[in-house]
Amino acid sequence: MKILVINPGSTSTKIAVYENETPLLVRNIKHTVEELSVYPQVIDQFEFRKNLVLQELEANGIPFAFDAVIGRGGLVKPIPGGVYAVNEAMKQDTLHAMRTHACNLGGLIAAELAASLPDCPAFIADPGVVDELEDVARISGSPLMPKITIWHALNQKAIARRFAKEQGTKYEELDLIICHLGGGISIAVHQHGKAIDANNALDGEGPFSPERAGTLPAGQLIDICYSGQFTKDELKKRISGRAGLTAHLGTTDVPAIIKAIEEGDKKAELILDAMIYNVAKAIGGAATVLCGKVDAILLTGGIAYSDYIISRLKKRISFLAPIHVYPGEGEMESLAFNALGALRGELPVQIYK
C-alpha cells in the first residue's frame, strides 16, 4: 500500500511517501519569512503548499497514485485521539478555525489530493487538539475560561507507543509523563493510553519555550492589554511567535544560545536555565497527577538533541522516574503508520462531528 503524507508547519512543508512501512521519499521544504509574507492569512497558502507537494512528487519521479493521503490535523474542535476521515464538517471547521496555524492546511490538502484519485481516502491522526482530559483537569480558576489543551499529540503518542514496544508492553498499560521540547513545549500525563492532562502549548499555559510565553502573570497581562501600547494581534504575537527565548534573547536558535553561554554570556545562561527550570517544575507537577506512580518520563522534540538542556533537566527530575530520551519528531512515520493501520482495519477510522 502506498501512502502520501503531508505535514505543513509554520516554516516548512514536510512530505513523505511510504510503501507499506518503508519510506520511499522524505522531504522537508523550508520556507522563508519573505516567501510566506505574501499571503495575508495562513489559509491563503493552500494552493502554494499543495503545488509544492505535486512538484516534489514529479521531481522525484513518483507517480500520483496512492491508497491513502494523510495530513497533519488542524486546530478543529477538541476530539479524542485516533485516525479520522477528513469529511465536510472537518473541512468547514478547519477553514473557520479559532486559532491560526499551518497545520490547518494538512487535512485540506490531503482531502483535495485524495479526491482526484479513485477510492483514495483522506485522513488525519492525533491532531494537536486531542482532548482526553479528566474532568478535574478542565477546571480553571474562572468559569469564563475553562482549560483547553493544544499539544504535540501526534509525536507524543507515537513516542509512547515506540517506548511501550521497546519495553515489551502496550501503551495502554503504562503511566507516562512525556515532554515535547520544540518551538513550543508540551507536557502531558499519559495514563493507560489516554492523555488525562496536558498543557496548552500554543498560546498561554505551561513553561515558556523558544517562541511561546507559557503561563504569564494575569494581572500584569490585563494591564498591558489596556495600556494602549499594542494591538490585539501584536499582543497575540508576544504570547506566541515572538515570546519566550526570542523575546528575551532575540533568537529561537538553541545551539546558538548555548554557544553564547560557552563564550560567557551570563544573560543567555540565566534565560535558558529559567526555561529548563520551568520545564522541570511542570514535569514535577505532572507527577502528582499520577500520585507519583510514574513508569517513565520521555523527553522528545528537536531540543532533546541538546546535551546541555537534557543534562540539566535530568538533574532536576531524575528522582521522579526513569528518563528516556527520543530526540526529534517521528511525525511523518506516525502519520504513515496511522494511515496503514486504518487501511488494514487495525485502527478504527473515526467520524468527525
Swiss-Prot record:
Transmembrane segments: none
Keywords for this protein: ATP-binding, Cytoplasm, Kinase, Nucleotide-binding, Transferase
GO molecular function: acetate kinase activity; ATP binding; butyrate kinase activity
Top-level class of the enzyme under EC nomenclature: transferase
GO biological processes: acetate metabolic process
GO cellular component, one term: cytoplasm
Subcellular location: Cytoplasm
Keyword Endoplasmic reticulum: no
Main location: cytoplasm
Record bears the keyword ATP-binding: yes
Assigned protein family: Belongs to the acetokinase family.
Protein name: Probable butyrate kinase
Organism whose genome encodes this protein: Bacteroides thetaiotaomicron (strain ATCC 29148 / DSM 2079 / JCM 5827 / CCUG 10774 / NCTC 10582 / VPI-5482 / E50)
